[in-house]
Structure formats: C-alpha cells, structure tokens
C-alpha cells in the first residue's frame, strides 16, 4: 500500500466473519512457522527489528474472527499465507542475492522510507489533525487520512490524531493491515473474500480478466500501477512471497496468481 493508487474512502463494514469460522489463527500458523516465514525481520539492518511479533499478530487476528478461520483448512491457510505475502512485499528489505533469498526478508520496515508528503486530502469526514502526517506505516503501509480514519474507527483507536501508533504499537499495526484485508471498498471486494473463495466476479470483472485468485488481491492493493500491462517485477515479488509461505504451511497456491492481464478496478 506504500505505492497504492488512491483508494476512495468508504465506511465499509469489517468482515468480521465470512462463511464458517473456526478457532484462532494460531491453529493455522505456529510461532515457528511465523518465524520461518519472516526469517530476517529482526535483522540488525531492518528498521522494524523487534517490532513485529507473533503474539501481536495473533492478538490482532483475534479481533477479526473470520481471518484464517473461514472455509476449508486449505482456504484458511491461503488466507494467512496471502496476507503475510502481500504485506511482506510492502515491507520487504530483501534483494535478489539476499541471504536465504529475497523472500525471507518480509516485515523489515514499519514505516515508509523518506516520506516527504503528509498524505492529507481535505475531508469533512476524515479531517487531518494539525501537524499529523499519514504516510505509509505498518504491514500494509497504511497511508492517507481517508484510510487512517476508517481503520481507526473500526479498531477503536483515533488514528487521525495518533497515526504514529501504527508504527509504535505492534498490535494496532497488525490490526490496521487486517482491517484493510477484511474490508471491501466498492467496487473492490475484500482480499479475504477473494482468497477464501467467497467472492464471485461480476460480468464486468470477468470482462476485465479478474478471476478469483491471488492476482486479484494484488489488483485490489496496487492494481493501478502493477496490473494490466504484462509482466511486472512487483507482481512477481508478491507471488514469490506467497509461494514460499504456502509451501511452509503445506497448501497449494490455487489458480490465477498474477494480474498481468487484468484491468485495474475503476
């Protein structure tokens, strides 16, 4: 979301549970698997060293009971793998020849590097607080006041007045990313609904090449910049994280992993 094209803010209901929910996310991903996925997040070179913890992730996930708990065991695993993959791309510190590979370096950053803008768009509904800046923070790199406002309302924290909480409180940080993951912003479905098979594409979606799968989630997050123009290294990076995490959780990838030939959402 660091480079996310402008998302129209809507007050959407967080999808707290879609379909049949089962248990805690800790039954899907163990502490050891979390550490294996995000192998170098606590490396000394990482800005977010010590910030993103398994306990904070589980605590945040427990506030969204549908996450990692909807549908079959495979659907639940893909939900977790896809969430951690997309957010790993947003926070990556990896490079092509990095130790253990580029896809072992997710969650290296907790806030946008070199942010110069305040990301404040005039809004009566989500007014910017004096002196506050709404640059990318947290796993999804939440940005703009019109995202901080509804995210904060959904999780019960005033993020318009306290945006720095997304980079100082790890549970709040994960909650903002999960809010984005679980919440539809029309005409876009929620990422959660897509990866768990609860989204049915419309005729317009099908005409735009948008079929259920991981690729549509990339389109939701940053389709305006990454989708619909053939091969894109950023899309490939997201897929690389996803495949690695699916392998760790022991689940297949599903279909339609890229968005190379998908038109972005309007």
From Swiss-Prot:
Assigned GO CC terms: extracellular region
Tissues expressing the protein: Localized to the starchy endoderm of the seed May localize to other parts of the seed including the aleurone cells (at protein level).
PROSITE patterns membership: CHITINASE_19_1, CHITINASE_19_2
Effect of residue 143 to A: Chitinase activity is reduced to 1.2% of wild-type. Decreased anti-fungal activity
MF annotations from Gene Ontology: chitin binding; chitinase activity; endochitinase activity
Stored CDD domains: chitinase_GH19
Cystine pairings recorded for this chain: 46-108, 120-128, 246-259
pH profile of the protein: Optimum pH is about 5.0. Stable between pH 4-8.
Catalytic activity line of the entry: Random endo-hydrolysis of N-acetyl-beta-D-glucosaminide (1->4)-beta-linkages in chitin and chitodextrins
Presence of keyword Transport: no
Thermal dependence, as annotated: Enzyme activity is retained almost fully under 40 degrees Celsius and completely destroyed at 70 degrees Celsius. At 60 degrees Celsius the activity was 15-30% compared to the untreated enzyme.
Keyword Electron transport: no
Keyword entries, A-Z: Antimicrobial, Carbohydrate metabolism, Chitin degradation, Chitin-binding, Disulfide bond, Fungicide, Glycosidase, Hydrolase, Plant defense, Polysaccharide degradation, Signal
Pfam families: Glyco_hydro_19
Residues in the signal sequence: 1-23
EC primary class: hydrolase
EC number: 3.2.1.14
Active site: 90 (proton donor)
GO BP term, example: cell wall macromolecule catabolic process
Family, similarity comment: Belongs to the glycosyl hydrolase 19 family. Chitinase class II subfamily.
Protein name from the UniProt record: Basic endochitinase C
Species: Secale cereale
């Amino acid at each position: 979301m660091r480079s996310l094209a402008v998302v129209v803010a809507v007050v959407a209901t967080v999808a707290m549970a879609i379909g049949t929910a089962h248990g805690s996310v800790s039954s899907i991903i163990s502490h050891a698997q979390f550490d294996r996925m995000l192998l170098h997040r606590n490396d000394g070179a990482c800005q977010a060293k010590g910030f993103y913890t398994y306990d904070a992730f589980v605590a945040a996930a427990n506030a969204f009971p549908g996450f990692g708990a909807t549908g079959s065991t495979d659907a639940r695993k893909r939900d977790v793998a896809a969430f951690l993959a997309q957010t790993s791309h947003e926070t990556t510190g990896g490079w092509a020849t990095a130790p253990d590979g580029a896809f072992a370096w997710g969650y290296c950053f907790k806030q946008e590097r070199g942010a110069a803008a305040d990301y404040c768009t005039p809004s009566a509904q989500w007014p910017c607080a004096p002196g506050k800046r709404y640059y990318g923070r947290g796993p999804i790199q939440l940005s703009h006041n019109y995202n901080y406002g509804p995210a904060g309302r959904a999780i019960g924290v005033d993020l318009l007045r306290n945006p720095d909480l997304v980079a100082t409180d790890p549970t709040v940080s994960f909650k903002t990313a999960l809010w984005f993951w679980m919440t539809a912003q029309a005409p876009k479905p929620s990422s959660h609904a897509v990866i768990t098979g609860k989204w049915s594409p419309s005729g317009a979606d099908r005409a735009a090449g948008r079929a259920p799968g991981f690729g549509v989630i990339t389109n939701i997050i940053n389709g305006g910049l990454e989708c619909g123009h053939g091969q894109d290294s950023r899309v490939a990076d997201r897929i690389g994280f996803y495949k690695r995490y699916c392998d760790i959780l022991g689940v297949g990838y599903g279909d339609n992993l890229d968005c190379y030939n998908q038109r972005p959402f309007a």
